[in-house]
Curated annotation (Swiss-Prot):
Places the protein is found: Secreted
Keywords of the record: Antimicrobial, Secreted, Signal
Signal sequence, start to end: 1-25
GO CC, any one term: extracellular region
Tissue spec: Expressed by the venom gland.
Main location: secreted
Organism: Dinoponera quadriceps (South American ant)
Name of this chain's protein: M-poneratoxin-Dq4e
Domain of life according to the entry: Eukaryota
Chain ranges passing through the membrane: none
Proregion span(s): 26-39
Free-text function comment from the UniProt entry: May have antimicrobial properties, like most ant linear peptides. In addition, when tested in vitro on the parasite Trypanosoma cruzi (responsible of the Chagas disease), is able to moderately reduce the number of the three forms (epimastigote, trypomastigote and amastigote) by inducing cell death through necrosis.
């Protein structure tokens, strides 16, 4: 199954939003969990940011190319 760059970027952004909401819920429940959840989210972002930036750049190029046609 071949996924478009838009579909992949949308899925990644949705996953980040879900993780952010989980971190926020943990922060409300417990201050210690807040620091741990944010650290986990930062680790996840540092691990995946290159892929996300690449996909977003490809989406931008695809959008520019589509607009030019």
């Amino acid at each position: 199954m071949k996924l478009s760059a838009f579909t992949l970027a949308f899925a990644l952004i949705l996953m980040m939003a879900i993780m952010y909401n989980m971190a926020e819920a943990a922060a409300l429940a417990d201050a210690d969990a807040d620091a741990e959840a944010i650290a986990g989210l930062k680790d996840w972002w540092n691990k995946h940011k290159d892929k996300i930036v690449k996909v977003v750049k490809e989406m931008g190029k695809a959008g520019i190319n589509a607009a030019g046609k």
